Amino acid sequence: PDKAFSAIPIACSSSHSAQNIALNELARQAIMADPVWDNGKYVLKNVQPKNGLAVARMVGHISYLSEKGMQEKFGRKLQEKADYEFSFNADFQVESYLRHQGYAFVERFDANSVLYITRAMDYFDLSKQFKGGLVEAFKNQKTKFLIISFSSDWLYTTKDNKDIVIALNASGADVSYSEIITDKGHDSFLLDEPEFLKTLKGFIAVSYTHLTLPTMR
């Protein structure tokens, strides 16, 4: 922490909620239920549990969006058809979208990696190692913080982010906070969100105006 002049935690939390853990468990179970997973030994056969990994990605992708955003983008629109097929094909656009996102993911990610990364995220608890909780964790901080949340993010909520802000304030840290009003959910930080970009630029400009960088030798 002493080596960081400033930090911008974006759409995060100090630990996963029960809902976060539950969503990750759904993803893990989808992978492990795929017969190709073979207790993680699929790598020895040079194969990938594609179906399980695709479903895991679908679960994750839903959590990155918002209900309003999904409704406005997809609603109940059908996928290139005039009426229901009364089958298990993708009748709705949102079904087709999820399938595309799921199976595109398997080409660039590894199933075992998802298991371990989600497990590590679930175990992470910033306050656990400090008896005083988050306030103690942030004690004697010299880093300048900007915490940013998104109003429609239900994965890492505004409350999750405000809890960090409250703890930083209580510890005497230099912290500012901004909630970006948007219907794009958790994925907002990856998208063209003008207010988000303006907030970042403003913080960086003010933070580094009078900063003297060390001379390189």
What are these regions (language model features)?
Residues 134, 157-167:
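Short alpha-helix in the alpha/beta-hydrolase fold that links the catalytic acid
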Residues 140-145:
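Short, proline-enriched alpha-helix->beta-strand connector loops that line the catalytic pocket
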Residues 183-193:
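Catalytic histidine-centered segment of alpha/beta-hydrolase-like enzymes
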Residues 152-156:
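Acidic catalytic loop of the alpha/beta-hydrolase fold
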Residues 168-182:
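Catalytic histidine neighborhood in serine/cysteine hydrolases
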Residues 209-215:
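Conserved small/polar residues in nucleotide/adenosyl-binding loops
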Residues 9-104:
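Alpha/beta-hydrolase-fold enzymes
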Residues 147-149:
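Short beta-strand/loop motif that positions the catalytic acidic residue
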